[in-house]
């Protein structure tokens, strides 16, 4: 009986693997997805910057249809179609919709969009951090370096645990 259940599991496993191998998949290059994110963020930043000048009725041309290629900027009409990658099927991404709408992480408003305008405010907050900071850690690193290392640790871009920072 155990041999029959083991062979039935093997048969189901083989069937599922082979059925996924025949399916066609469509993909969009990561470069184009990242370009879309950058252009959407750029347009949002411009909209927030010019929201107080509502009397202007001229609309800026959209950069969404263009991409940066080796030959320069060119129209991206034919890249809107999905590409057939054959029977290469990634089992992790199986079942996800083909047209995922990629949105920017955060829609920044006000002075966070253009930090160059609030340079005086940044200097004051840095000065407050220096006055409040730990005495034993401030001797080892300057304040900016310590904050940068902690942020890198929190993002997981380094190969050491957070407590070593």
Curated annotation (Swiss-Prot):
Residues 1-21 form the signal peptide. InterPro entries: Prepro-melanin_conc_hormone. Residues 69-89 are annotated as: Disordered. It comes from the Eukaryota. Pro-MCH is processed differentially in the brain and in peripheral organs producing two neuropeptides; NEI and MCH. A third peptide, NGE, may also be produced. Preferential processing in neurons by prohormone convertase 2 (PC2) generates NEI. MCH is generated in neurons of the lateral hypothalmic area by several prohormone convertases including PC1/3, PC2 and PC5/6. The modification Isoleucine amide is found at residue 143. MCH is present in all regions of the brain and in neurointermediate lobe of the pituarity gland, with highest concentrations in the hypothalamus. Also expressed to a much lesser extent in stomach, lamina propria of both duodenum and colon, ovary, thymus, pancreas, adrenal gland and testis (spermatogonia, early spermatocytes and Sertoli cells). Weak expression in heart and lung. The other peptides are expressed at least in Sertoli cells, nei being also expressed in brain, stomach and proximal duodenum. In brain exclusively mature mch and nei peptides are present. Keywords: Amidation, Cleavage on pair of basic residues, Disulfide bond, Hormone, Neuropeptide, Secreted, Signal. GO terms for molecular function: melanin-concentrating hormone activity; type 1 melanin-concentrating hormone receptor binding. It is found in: Secreted. GO terms for cellular component: extracellular space; nucleus; synapse. Pfam families: Pro-MCH. Induction: Inhibited by neurogenic stress or osmotic stress. Residues 69-82 have a biased composition (Basic and acidic residues). The keyword Secreted applies. Disulfide bonds join 153-162. GO terms for biological process: chemical synaptic transmission; drinking behavior; feeding behavior; lactation; learning or memory; negative regulation of blood pressure; negative regulation of synaptic transmission, dopaminergic; neuropeptide signaling pathway. Belongs to the melanin-concentrating hormone family. MCH inhibits ACTH secretion at the end of the light on period which corresponds to the peak of the circadian rhythm in ACTH. Inhibits also stress induced ACTH release during the light off period of the cycle. Involved as a neurotransmitter or neuromodulator in a broad array of neuronal functions. Stimulates sexual behavior when injected into the ventromedial nucleus, this effect is antagonized by NEI. In the medial preoptic area, stimulates anxiety and sexual behavior. Antagonizes inhibitory effect of melanotropin alpha on exploration behavior. This is Pro-MCH.
């Amino acid at each position: 009986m155990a041999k029959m259940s083991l062979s039935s599991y093997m048969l189901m496993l083989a069937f599922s693997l082979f059925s996924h191998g025949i399916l066609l998949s469509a993909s969009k290059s990561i470069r184009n997805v990242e370009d879309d994110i950058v252009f959407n963020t750029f347009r949002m930043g411009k909209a927030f910057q010019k929201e107080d000048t509502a009397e202007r009725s001229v609309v800026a041309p959209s950069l969404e249809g263009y991409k940066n290629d080796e030959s320069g900027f060119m129209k991206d009409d034919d890249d809107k179609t999905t590409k057939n990658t054959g029977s290469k099927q990634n089992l992790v991404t199986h079942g996800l919709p083909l047209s995922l709408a990629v949105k920017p992480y955060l829609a920044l408003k006000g002075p966070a969009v253009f930090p160059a305008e609030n340079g005086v405010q940044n200097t004051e907050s840095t000065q407050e951090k220096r006055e409040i900071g730990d005495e034993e850690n401030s001797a080892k690193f300057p304040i900016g370096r310590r904050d940068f290392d902690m942020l890198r640790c929190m993002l997981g871009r380094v190969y050491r645990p957070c407590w070593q920072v």
